[in-house]
Amino acid sequence: MYAVIENGGKQYRVTVGDKLRLERMEMEPGAELALDRVLMVGVGDDVQVGRPLVEGAAVKATVLSQGRAKKVHIFKMRRRKHYRKQQGHRQYFTEVRITGIEA
């Protein structure tokens, strides 16, 4: 069984047992959460597609940790003008493990 969920403007295909990095949520490690924005649920060849969401479907997950991703370096430069600008960014994330899919 698998599901397609939406979180933070991105879509993820998940199955039970998957580890996933989602946008940061203010939750402690070990906390349970239910992701109810389920776009699609599939069992073998039987697929249920929502319009836009599947009614009554939810994905259960457990928070594993909070963290920050690797740094993304931004470098701007104008040729021949000696203009250079550097910037960096580290995105916060919440790592979760999928524990169940209800459809």
From Swiss-Prot:
<keyword id="KW-0687">Ribonucleoprotein</keyword>
<keyword id="KW-0689">Ribosomal protein</keyword>
<dbReference type="GO" id="GO:0019843">
    <property type="term" value="F:rRNA binding"/>
</dbReference>
<dbReference type="InterPro" id="IPR018258">
    <property type="entry name" value="Ribosomal_bL21_CS"/>
</dbReference>
<keyword id="KW-0699">rRNA-binding</keyword>
<protein>
    <recommendedName>
        <fullName>Large ribosomal subunit protein bL21</fullName>
    </recommendedName>
</protein>
<dbReference type="GO" id="GO:1990904">
    <property type="term" value="C:ribonucleoprotein complex"/>
</dbReference>
<dbReference type="InterPro" id="IPR036164">
    <property type="entry name" value="bL21-like_sf"/>
</dbReference>
<comment type="function">
    <text>This protein binds to 23S rRNA in the presence of protein L20.</text>
</comment>
<dbReference type="GO" id="GO:0006412">
    <property type="term" value="P:translation"/>
</dbReference>
<dbReference type="GO" id="GO:0003735">
    <property type="term" value="F:structural constituent of ribosome"/>
</dbReference>
<comment type="similarity">
    <text>Belongs to the bacterial ribosomal protein bL21 family.</text>
</comment>
<comment type="subunit">
    <text>Part of the 50S ribosomal subunit. Contacts protein L20.</text>
</comment>
<dbReference type="Pfam" id="PF00829">
    <property type="entry name" value="Ribosomal_L21p"/>
</dbReference>
<dbReference type="GO" id="GO:0005840">
    <property type="term" value="C:ribosome"/>
</dbReference>
<dbReference type="GO" id="GO:0005737">
    <property type="term" value="C:cytoplasm"/>
</dbReference>
<keyword id="KW-0694">RNA-binding</keyword>
<dbReference type="InterPro" id="IPR001787">
    <property type="entry name" value="Ribosomal_bL21"/>
</dbReference>
<dbReference type="InterPro" id="IPR028909">
    <property type="entry name" value="bL21-like"/>
</dbReference>
